[in-house]
A protein has these predicted regions:
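N-terminal cap/lid segment of alpha/beta-hydrolase-fold proteins
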Residues: 1-18
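Active-site glycine-rich loops that stabilize anionic/oxyanionic intermediates
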Residues: 21, 29-32, 183
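Structural cue for short, hydrophobic secondary-structure segments
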Residues: 26-29, 53
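The serine-hydrolase catalytic nucleophile loop
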Residues: 30-42, 191
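Conserved alpha/beta-hydrolase
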Residues: 41-63
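Catalytic nucleophile-loop/oxyanion-hole region of alpha/beta-hydrolase
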Residues: 59-88
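Gly/Ala-rich beta-loop-alpha elbow adjacent to hydrolase catalytic centers
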Residues: 95-104
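The alpha/beta-hydrolase serine catalytic core
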Residues: 111-195, 199-206, 211-214, 220-233
Length: 233
């Protein structure tokens, strides 16, 4: 398929396929990059969609950035890509995975998109942070005092990030949404996902033996079938 590298207002991006009236913005999670949207792009191209993927802060071409993967930075950059998508296509949808889903919830809380597909979404970052603090006996006062606290899980807790997340709970979501969740997801609690789905009338599919990171042959095949089923011409 056609694959065009570009910069959208300074953000390293790829446009997959040919320009069309229907566009998906692909928003990846931690440890991923814009190139990993290829499988998704190949599937939805057959349904008449183009796809824009981009590197989130500290990922892909931006791997050497430091301390830029903050919600306010991510929102600003998703908005840049969204504005560009609007300039070329009247119908905008999103595909987001893991932390990318959380950043999407913040960015588009007041906007009704055509549709959203969430894979292994982080839907309540407050809860995830609190769980991490509980496991490693870290208090809010310690985070505020030290500014940043590395954890054995490889995740560093920052005071500015913590304060932002606590001040911005997810209370609104207007976009018709479908969620694919793995039975053995170790980051997103099933109850959090089901509560979100019930609250915002989302479709939810559970993959038996699925994980947070869909990477095995069986998992990717299941994911592909899920996308193919939900995205129509």
């Amino acid at each position: 398929m056609k694959k065009q590298y570009c910069y959208i207002d300074g953000v390293p991006s790829i446009y997959w396929g040919n320009p069309t009236e229907k566009t998906f913005i692909s928003i990846h999670g931690v440890g991923s990059n814009k190139e990993e949207a290829e499988l998704f792009a190949r599937i939805v191209e057959t349904k008449g969609y183009g796809v824009i993927s981009f590197d989130m802060p500290e990922h892909g071409e931006r791997i050497n950035e430091k301390n830029t993967l903050r919600p306010w930075n991510c929102i600003e950059e998703i908005e840049k890509v969204y504005r560009y998508a609007q300039s070329i296509s009247p119908n905008i949808s999103i595909f987001a995975s893991s932390l990318g889903a959380y950043m999407s919830l913040l960015t588009f809380s007041e906007i009704k998109l055509e549709k959203a597909l969430f894979l292994s979404p982080i839907l309540d970052l407050q809860r995830l942070i609190w769980n991490l603090m509980s496991v490693y006996n870290i208090t809010e006062a310690e985070i505020m005092e030290k500014g940043e606290i590395p954890t054995p899980a490889g995740i560093t807790l920052y005071d500015d990030y913590y304060k932002y997340v606590m001040a911005h709970p997810i209370t609104k979501w207007k976009t018709p949404t479908e969620i694919l969740y793995g039975e053995h997801d170790n980051l997103s609690e099933y109850k959090i996902v089901t509560d979100f789905a019930d609250r915002f009338d989302c479709g939810l599919e559970l993959m038996k033996n699925g994980e947070h990171w869909f990477h095995t042959e069986d998992q990717l095949a299941y994911f592909s079938d899920w996308v193919d089923k939900l995205v129509t011409d």
